Amino acid sequence: MCGIVGYTGSDIAKNILVTGLKRMEYRGYDSSGVALEVGEGAAAHLDVIRRVGKVAGLESELSNIDSDATCGIGHTRWATHGKPSVVNAHPHTSCDGRIAIVHNGIIENFAELREELEGRGHHFKSETDTEVFAHLIEEAYAETHDLMASVREACTHVVGAYGLAAVCADEPGVIAVARKDSPIVVGVGETGSYVASDVIALIDATRDVVVLEDGQFAKLTPAGVEYTDEAGNAIEPKVTHSDWDLDMAEKGGYPDFMLKEIHEQPRVVRDTLVGRMTPAGELDIDELGLSLEELNDIDRVYVIACGTSYHAGLIAKNLIEGWARIPTEVEAASEFRYRNPIITPTTLVVAVSQSGETADTLAAIRDARIKGAKVFGITNVVGSPVARESDGVIYTKANKEIAVASTKSFIGQVVSLTLLALLLAQVKYRLTTKQARMLFRELSDTAEQIQWILDTQTEAVHEAALLCKDAQSALFVGRGMGAAISYEGALKLTEVSYLHAEAYAAGEMKHGPIALIDPGFPVIAVATKSATYDKTVSNLMECKARGAKVIVVATEGDEEINKIADCIIRVPAVRDVFSPITASVPLQLLAREVAILRGCDVDQPRNLAKSVTVE
């Protein structure tokens, strides 16, 4: 899944497709490709060109092809089923190569469909779920000789989500489009018809677009677009006019990238988890790079990271030790390589880096490998140095993150590290299959819980920000998982608002930090329901008694906290081990809101860079 683009009209298609794919590069991807309709009559066929790596590589290859094709489809892929490779890249084709498709989404019953199709003589070339669609359409086309009808028929067999565009060499100039739970936009410009998964790919051609709804289909031709429902009945589309410029389109209509990326976090959770658990309840991490026997031998774990990634590591420590019972240490990468840590062949070093190119983290990886450790990477960038130099890797599927302050990548890291902790616990037989399946389901539910926070807590966040905006300093506190999130909350506030903030485990208050508190001093606490809730409340009462303005991230329905809090930001009730995923979102929103009130640039804070590539 990642980006879809299609064009049919009078202009040269390859140029339009490449431009559209480039517009969507910010979404992240590992490969790209196009299918172009070439020739006429009996000589008509499809040229399919695919590349691993950047769209620039695809563009270079296309520049060497003298093609006047005026109809085609393109795609950027981020692997979900099957590793990044040319054979797994889109577009995928039917057995005879006369139908090509691009697809975003997940086909949940693809294994069953593939087995049935192979039993009927179809030959699969890739490991992807998407290829199932090409063969289903091929079968239907043999009966209907109508591409749109064949796409509609194929969709009746599929369980899952799809944004789909298909072309057929026997129907020149036609693109058939379908949508269910995966975005698709359609537009008509002066020289033809367009389809994409993101309006940004169409912004140069047209400002009037139709956002397909679930169960709707579109047939694109150079003359225009026909819209139908699942039964093939014509429907009247709802046309939306966009006044966005390119900058606004890239931001998805949000005022800044930071807010856009905060709002993308439900999708990040879903994308990072998709396809990760088999129906039998076993975790499936194709990119593992380590055998189950090697994992079972692991007796010590180091999580090495910097900045926000370090805080994700603190959460991982609790999970790995709690579930797998493996001693785990979290280290700043800049310190790890200089202190001669104890490393043996049964040590696992987990390197966490959003960019995959953090200099200190890379140096620590190399040092650990020399000493014989197994190395596992958590990163957001396919093919990055961290990915290349690790034995295995989990990609966070956050897509490109533009704001300097990491938000969605952090959530992706926490979810990925949670998967690793679950896997280690299963390998060590510390969790049963039933327990792992239950925890995985609850982890998946955090996507909806984040969405609830985004939908309901805007006013509370603004009220909390008003209590902080004129402060000189702020204190974040929490216990257990709440402490780990407090460290991240303090960093976010410092990064984007330039307000000095520190975080402490709440139990350390009386050992120094309480000396900071005077009337009006903001104290931000993570006090969700947990085994240490009462003790955290007691610490907050001490702050309140000294005049602090107490802002609390608290569980929905908790009335007790009302007695001491000046402002409450609510989060849904979750198992304590998953509270970092939900409780971090209000702190991200708070940091951004304080920064906005203080007139700061939230996307590009002063003195900071997105990735630190020097030591």
Question: What are the residue ranges of the model-derived segments?
Answer:
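Conserved short alpha-helical segments that host acidic/polar catalytic motifs at enzyme active sites
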Residues: 1-251, 255, 267-299, 338, ...
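Hydrophobic alpha-helical scaffolding
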Residues: 7-10, 103, 123, 140-144, ...
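Glycine-rich oxoanion-binding loops at beta->alpha junctions
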Residues: 70, 74-87, 279-293, 316-352, ...
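Active-site phosphate/pyrophosphate-binding segments
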Residues: 156, 265-269, 273-302, 392-522, ...
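Generic C-terminus detector
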Residues: 232, 549, 562-564, 570, ...
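Glycine-rich phosphate-binding loops that contact phosphosugars or nucleotide phosphates
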Residues: 296-438, 442-445, 526-571, 590
